[in-house]
Amino acid sequence: MADSDAQETRPPAKDSPFSIKNLLNIEDKPTKPKNGLGSSKGVFESGFFSRLGDLSLPRFELPAQRIGLPAQYLERASAWWYPYALGTHFRTAGAEKVNQRETSPILDRHTPDPPKSDQESKEESADDEIALEESDAEEPKKETDQEDDWMRKGEDLESDKKPCRKKKTRTVFSRSQVFQLESTFDIKRYLSSSERAGLAASLHLTETQVKIWFQNRRNKWKRQLAAELEAANMSHAAAQRIVRVPILYHDSGAPEATGGPGTNSPGGQPLLSFPHHMYYSNAVPLLRPV
């Protein structure tokens, strides 16, 4: 009786974390998976590891040589290998540092993306198709805009180049200067440097102006000579041209029978000829007087 009373008065034993009840409670309350479970932030915010805080899990020692990350990242993220340290009751300063570094590009690069539902994938594909159609419609507009810009740039460059061209100044000579230059040119076609300098000083011109005038005058003289030679050649060719006039004549053949008695043949012989000359005797009166 004493043993039975002691058993009845004994307080109920505290449920251990490994009891079936606790394990079933985890399965009875399934949590909806969030989109951020694949990222490190979703893992820390979810209550999965918080429920495992009371569990004593062994520490995993991973060599730094077999992992692609350097040893310094493994040392900083040591709290990753202690799941029980992520619980609500055993949150330490190391876990807080991990939460601060969870948004680093190195950790996000190695975490897988969360699975997307069919509806979300369809919406994204529809958005991509709309974006592609808009981009295709904008491409010809961009091309036309680029062509217009190119044409404008070309016009601007042409307008910029036009004022840069310098107009050649033409020297106007007086009548006395032209007369003196012409008379000198008739005497001598080419001038020496000393003669050109003396002529320029006498006419109050520069040597370059005199030199250019003589060059232009020689070109004009050569053109005049070429035109005169061409005209002389044409007149000589016209004089040597032979004009042939057709001459009408008849071939020497048989006399034509259609000719009259008074006509002559082409050979000069009469068409009707008699072999003997006709002699007439004295006239005999046909009627005798009675």
UniProtKB/Swiss-Prot annotation:
Residues 166-225 bind DNA. One of its GO terms (cellular component) is nucleus. SUPFAM superfamilies: Homeodomain-like. Residues 107-124, 138-162 have a biased composition (Basic and acidic residues). Residues 125-137 have a biased composition (Acidic residues). Expressed in the ear placode and vesicle and in cells forming the vestibulo-acoustic ganglion. It is found in: Nucleus. Pfam families: Homeodomain. Disulfide bonds: none annotated. Its main location: nucleus. Residues 1-41, 96-169 are annotated as: Disordered. GO terms for biological process: cell differentiation; nervous system development; regulation of transcription by RNA polymerase II. Transcription factor involved in specification of neuronal cell types and which is required for inner ear and hypothalamus development. Binds to the 5'-CAAGTG-3' core sequence. PANTHER family: HOMEOBOX PROTEIN HMX, HOMEOBOX PROTEIN HMX3. Belongs to the HMX homeobox family. This is Homeobox protein HMX3-B. It comes from Oryzias latipes (Japanese rice fish). The gene is hmx3b.
